[in-house]
């Protein structure tokens, strides 16, 4: 029997953007109706992709600023990062670029990143649309999410709704596939300098 693969996934994003609900629906199959801010939680889920069985450790994190110094403890030995935002919160997508991508690249520069839109079921919710219109905002569109994913160099962009379970499995199957890739550190060559080539002796 093939050795079971183990991979570690860390999920980050603004507080209340839907990270914990996404993990609970995937790992336990139930949607938590009461919001309890996360401090630090771990879940384990078995995922089968492309005929391979993977034990996926899911590390939930707190998005609130109070935990900015604690959160980096989650990153070591990770294989893939999910950066989440909420479709009903354009500000949470702004923070992907303003805060989350720089933090993730600082601690996990060589890992694949998936950008995940949570609460996709609220995109056409009349109450949400009305509420956001008061501040000249609108629910995040798929195109806006894809544009940010491209800008931050995400491995993939996905949308899901933990409440309806739509797209949830796809998020973690894609993340597991990404976690199984062989990663090379992303090196940004500074302007005016040439990349150093490594010599291989045969």
Curated annotation (Swiss-Prot):
One Gene Ontology molecular-function label: GDP binding
Subcellular location(s) per record: Cell membrane
CDD domains for the chain: RhoA_like
Top-level taxonomic group: Eukaryota
Keyword set includes Transmembrane helix: no
S-geranylgeranyl cysteine lipid sites: 199
Main location: membrane
Residue numbers covered by the propeptide annotation in the UniProt entry: 200-202
Keywords from the UniProt entry: Cell membrane, GTP-binding, Lipoprotein, Membrane, Methylation, Nucleotide-binding, Prenylation
Positions where Cysteine methyl ester occurs in the chain: 199
Topology in the lipid bilayer: Lipid-anchor
Residues involved in GTP binding: 13-20, 60-64, 118-121
Gene Ontology BP term (one): positive regulation of primary cell septum biogenesis
Pfam families: Ras
Disulfide bonds: none
UniProt short sequence motif Effector region, positions renumbered to this chain: 35-43
Cellular-component GO terms for this entry: cell cortex of growing cell tip; cell division site; cytoplasmic side of plasma membrane; cytosol; division septum; growing cell tip; medial cortex; nucleus
Record-linked PANTHER family: RHO FAMILY GTPASE
Biological function: Involved in the regulation of cell wall growth and actin cytoskeleton organization. Activates (1,3)-beta-D-glucan synthase.
The family this protein is said to belong to: Belongs to the small GTPase superfamily. Rho family.
Protein name (record): GTP-binding protein rho1
């Amino acid at each position: 029997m093939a050795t079971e693969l183990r991979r570690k996934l860390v999920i980050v994003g603004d507080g209340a953007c839907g990270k914990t609900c996404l993990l609970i629906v995937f790992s336990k199959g139930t949607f938590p109706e009461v919001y309890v801010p996360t401090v630090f939680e771990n879940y384990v889920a078995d995922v089968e992709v492309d005929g391979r069985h993977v034990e996926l450790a899911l590390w939930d994190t707190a998005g609130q600023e109070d935990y900015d110094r604690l959160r980096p403890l989650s990153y070591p030995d990770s294989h893939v990062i999910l950066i989440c935002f909420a479709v009903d919160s354009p500000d949470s997508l702004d923070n992907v670029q303003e805060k989350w991508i720089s933090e993730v690249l600082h601690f996990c520069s060589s890992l694949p990143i998936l950008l995940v839109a949570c609460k996709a079921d609220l995109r056409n919710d009349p109450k949400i649309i009305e509420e956001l219109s008061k501040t000249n905002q609108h629910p995040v569109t798929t195109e806006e999410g894809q544009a940010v994913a491209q800008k931050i160099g995400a491995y993939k962009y996905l949308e899901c709704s933990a409440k309806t379970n739509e797209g949830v499995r796809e998020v973690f199957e894609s993340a597991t596939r990404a976690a199984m890739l062989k990663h090379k550190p992303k090196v940004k060559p500074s302007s005016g300098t040439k990349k150093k080539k490594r010599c291989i002796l045969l």
